[in-house]
């Protein structure tokens, strides 16, 4: 599958190229050139899958030109095994026709863990294949920083610099961002806000 810029002026790229590039050269966002089609029967057959198996089925068409099914399965399984509920995202019934999807069972208790924990593994996989290293600089005033840090803290291919506004994040968020151990993680408090 190829990915194209929303502004239409950048070359199309593969999944791994997009993963390691970020924004398109024309300032746009990369989106799939086409969307995979799943039959009703196929979707119905997924209804009893666990979270990791479902994620694998949905993600595979988007990445299969760069990542084998078995590689993706390993990354997805390892990612969601670190969540603290066996269902990963349990659907809890509160009452008649009242349900809540719990999205706080990841390592940082933020819904962003669902994407950012897997993203770290996908990036590491691409960097290892290409024998490359990457520097990521991010700025956050919330839980994105801790989820991104947690997703990349074990990588020996990524150096991550996370900026957060000094005394403008909650104490829990500050501690999550500044106490995670990783030689590749650099957290910087910046006076002011952004």
Predicted regions and their residues:
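PLP-dependent amino-acid enzyme catalytic core
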Residues: 1-194
